[in-house]
Curated annotation (Swiss-Prot):
Residues engaged in binding [4Fe-4S] cluster 1: C68, C73, C79, S308
Organism: Shigella boydii serotype 18 (strain CDC 3083-94 / BS512)
CC per GO annotation: cytoplasm
Pathway membership: Protein modification; protein lipoylation via endogenous pathway; protein N(6)-(lipoyl)lysine from octanoyl-[acyl-carrier-protein]: step 2/2
A single MF term (Gene Ontology): 4 iron, 4 sulfur cluster binding
Name this protein carries in UniProt: Lipoyl synthase
EC number(s) stated in the UniProt entry for this protein: 2.8.1.8
Length: 321
């Protein structure tokens, strides 16, 4: 077990330092050999990285963050090369320390009051028609960051009136009433909150989160705005069974969720939870068929699918896998 550390405000803690603070068994110790990636998990990198570097430069110029970079998303090259990115607001330091996630943990600094304006200008400069806004968890804020989400939505729409906005929000633990009062007053076009995995291994995968709380968050937003699609996603390959995934899908439908994403979990480093299995493309196709039969209007299911992967196409109901 790594030696516990004293966190300094504004410092990013990753890998061994981050995992040392997790109140579960350190999965990086004494585990079996890593699974070999199957052929279908091989990523093709674009030959020209000009567009990728351009997006990174725009982010740096305005002091913005993308979850694509901060979470080491395997689709970064593809998405950046197509001129799309998922913006991460409220800084790049998360107050949670989930052992599947590569976003840094620590004591974050105060939110940047100018971030909504800078974000809106960057999006306008990039001439985006669909944008996904997500954030780190901010358990240090009284509203969990909900007002900052609302401020970003307002600023973006002022600069780009025709744009579609999807928000991928945290669970607002202990702050649901306050957060929903704010978010339902300034709603996005798609409201997304990920369950991430199945109840049986929730404490291991999402320490500090609660499965039923997340379902209730999705349900209550839908009750306030029945006309707005609600969306959720899971990572698979962490030890769950296909039957458990299907049961989570049923729970989501019972709570009014209409859009679903399922993708393969990939281990960011040796300090994170190991991959227990690789789910085949055929299995993903079967789960998509199950989802559509349950009444999901959209289901993006495939090895490289992530919540915001081609989110504009997902929202249009186009095939994403």
């Amino acid at each position: 077990m790594s030696k516990p550390i004293v966190m300094e405000r504004g410092v990013k803690y990753r890998d061994a330092d981050k995992m040392a603070l997790i109140p579960v068994k350190n999965v990086a110790i004494e585990r079996e050999a890593l699974l070999r990636k199957p052929e279908w998990m091989k990523i093709k990198l674009p030959a020209d990285s000009t567009r990728i570097q351009g997006i990174k430069a725009a982010m740096r110029k305005n002091g913005l963050h993308s979850v694509c970079e901060e979470a080491s998303c395997p689709n970064l090259a593809e998405c950046f090369n197509h001129g799309t990115a998922t913006f991460m607001i409220l800084g790049a330091i998360c107050t949670r320390r989930c052992p599947f996630c590569d976003v840094a943990h620590g004591r974050p600094v105060a939110p940047d009051a100018n971030e909504p304006v800078k974000l809106a200008q960057t999006i306008a400069d990039m001439a985006l028609r669909y944008v996904v806004i997500t954030s780190v968890d901010r358990d240090d804020l009284r509203d969990g960051g909900a007002q900052h989400f609302a401020d970003c939505i307002t600023a973006i729409r002022e600069k780009s009136p025709q744009i579609k906005i999807e928000t991928l929000v945290p669970d607002f633990r202990g702050r649901m009433d306050r957060a929903l009062d704010i978010l339902t007053a300034t709603p996005p076009d798609v409201f997304n909150h990920n369950l991430e995995n199945v109840p049986r291994i929730y404490r291991q995968v999402r320490p500090g989160a609660d499965y039923n709380w997340s379902l209730k968050l999705l349900e209550r937003f839908k009750e306030a705005h029945p006309e707005i699609p609600t969306k959720s996603g899971l990572m698979v390959g962490l030890g769950e069974t296909n039957e458990e995934i299907i049961e989570v899908m049923r729970d989501l439908r019972r709570h009014g969720v209409t859009m679903l994403t399922l993708g393969q979990y990939l281990q960011p480093s040796r300090h994170h939870l190991p991959v227990q299995r690789y789910v085949s493309p055929d299995e993903f196709d079967e789960m998509k068929a199950e989802a559509l039969a349950m009444g999901f209007t959209h289901a993006a299911c495939g090895p490289f699918v992530r919540s915001s992967y081609h989110a504009d196409l997902q929202a249009k109901g186009m095939e994403v896998k």
